[in-house]
């Protein structure tokens, strides 16, 4: 009874509001994203709210001893104060959640390699024990040390024989021809089999996996991202699990930003571009550089384009769905009407279309609807990225900030530091500058040839970049960094260079 009376006192209610106010201000300040003027405004608002609730909640003194006190106003004031306290605590938790999400995406400390034991479906080989005393095939030419580690772990569970192959084509044929009962591979390489076995994903199953975490070292950049130009590599990976899992880089986009001139350039590199892969003695598709880690992709592009990349970001494809939905959709222009090849339930109209997450991902991955295939897909990817950035840079996104943090958590990693992200957000909120965003795509031709590092004896299509286009795109990037304004010619309705 005494506790209830204590809780009903206006002093108690206002004390709760004071504590909630201090907590909210502390969390907002700790985030280091609000410009000073907004912190001052927040502080003034919190003080005014407390004073108003004091005025409403505190009972008036009686002029006469037998005069009745009015209870309606103090009761309403206490009720309103409680609601404000709850709202402030909720907002404080949201800010803490945001800090946690940013800390998670900027803490890139390891990459994960997943080794998978794969069998054909409907063969009665559904568990590791079913492969006991049978033959397992491996590829000894790629990632041999990690596969050997997985072989050792698997041998603790079952007995088996190993048959070695020197390329993925022969390894896949051995599985389909029943020369081996299963194959043990780095999961990120399973797309190698699609060149000869298009339905590999549907015809096989993974019956055992072994994960190996490898520490990665990232040299911290001393760039002040609010004053100095920088280039960030955005690598879209097709990993099925956590974004830390090594996977092909299906999307490779360079975003060059000059915070002083407010110029931004997006440069898209076709995933099949034939390049020398950093760290190995061979050339292959740029997408396959991702199999050796994000650092390999960064170094490969730096050497290929003769440019400097300051930061990297890995984005899981599933995060596109979550991010776009958290932004309440994006508006993107489509130059033709078509039905998604991957999902026949998704249809696109010609013109500007408001897309949800599923539609945006399907649009970004579509190539079958276009005569230029991957090149047009690169244009779509840039269009989606531009639309996302346009939404993210709008101050109104603060209303959806918690949902956005949920979307990127676990599906996004970057070598940008938490302080860098905070500084960029603070800069945008403080001055809300209008950005000049330009887009360009590396030009070239598709040719069928042998000699790729992964499948040297198999003739497949590679994208051979034009030297003139490499030079032009390098100049675009350097011009942005030098403070010049770049205008990319021959752009479509999304502003993308053809």
Spell out what each predicted region is.
Residues 5, 9, 34, 66-76, ...:
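Membrane-interfacial loop-to-transmembrane-helix junctions in polytopic alpha-helical membrane proteins
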Residues 30, 59-65, 94-97:
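Juxtamembrane transmembrane-helix termini
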Residues 42-81:
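Cytosolic-side transmembrane helix boundary signature
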């Amino acid at each position: 009874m005494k506790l209830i009376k204590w809780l009903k006192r206006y002093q108690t209610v206002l004390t709760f509001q004071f504590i909630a106010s201090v907590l909210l201000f502390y969390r907002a300040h700790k985030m280091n994203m609000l410009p000073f003027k907004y912190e001052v405004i927040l502080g003034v608002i919190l003080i005014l709210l407390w004073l108003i609730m004091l005025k409403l909640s505190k009972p008036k003194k009686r002029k006469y001893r037998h005069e009745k006190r009015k209870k309606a106003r103090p009761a309403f004031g206490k009720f309103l104060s409680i609601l404000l306290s709850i709202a402030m605590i909720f907002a404080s938790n949201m800010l803490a959640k945001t800090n946690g999400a940013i800390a998670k995406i900027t803490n890139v400390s390891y990459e994960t390699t997943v080794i998978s034991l794969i069998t054909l479906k409907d063969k009665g080989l559904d568990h590791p024990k079913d492969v006991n005393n049978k033959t397992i095939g491996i590829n000894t030419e790629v990632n041999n040390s990690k596969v050997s580690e997985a072989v050792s772990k698997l041998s603790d569970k079952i007995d088996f024989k190993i048959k070695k192959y020197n390329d993925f084509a022969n390894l896949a044929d051995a599985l389909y021809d029943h020369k081996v009962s299963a194959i043990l591979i780095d999961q990120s390489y399973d797309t190698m089999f699609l060149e000869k076995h298009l339905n590999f994903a549907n015809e096989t199953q993974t019956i055992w996996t072994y994960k190996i975490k490898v520490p990665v070292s990232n040299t911290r950049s001393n760039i002040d991202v609010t004053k100095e130009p920088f280039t960030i590599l955005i690598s879209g990976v097709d990993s099925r699990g956590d974004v830390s899992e090594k996977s092909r880089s299906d999307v490779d986009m360079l975003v060059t930003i000059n915070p002083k001139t407010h110029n931004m350039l997006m440069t898209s590199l076709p995933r099949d571009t034939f390049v020398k892969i950093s760290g190995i003695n061979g050339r292959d598709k740029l997408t396959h550089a991702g199999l050796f880690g994000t650092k390999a992709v960064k170094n490969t592009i730096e050497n290929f384009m003769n440019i400097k990349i300051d930061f990297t970001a890995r984005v899981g494809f599933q995060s596109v769905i979550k991010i776009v939905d958290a932004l309440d959709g994006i508006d993107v222009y489509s130059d033709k009407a078509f039905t998604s090849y991957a999902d026949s339930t998704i249809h696109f109209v010609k013109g500007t279309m408001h897309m949800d997450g599923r539609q945006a991902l399907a649009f970004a991955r579509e190539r079958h609807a276009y005569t230029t295939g991957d090149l047009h897909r690169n244009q779509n990817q840039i269009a989606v990225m531009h639309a996302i950035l346009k939404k993210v840079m709008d101050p109104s996104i603060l209303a959806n900030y918690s949902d956005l943090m949920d979307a990127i958590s676990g599906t996004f990693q970057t070598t940008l530091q938490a302080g860098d992200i905070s500084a960029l957000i603070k800069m945008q909120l403080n001055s809300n500058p209008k950005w000049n965003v330009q887009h360009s795509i590396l030009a070239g031709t598709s040719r069928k040839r042998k000699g790729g590092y992964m499948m040297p004896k198999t003739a497949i299509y590679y994208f051979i970049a034009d030297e003139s286009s490499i030079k032009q795109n390098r100049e675009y990037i350097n011009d942005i960094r030098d403070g010049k304004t770049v205008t990319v010619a021959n752009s479509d309705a999304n502003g993308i260079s053809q």
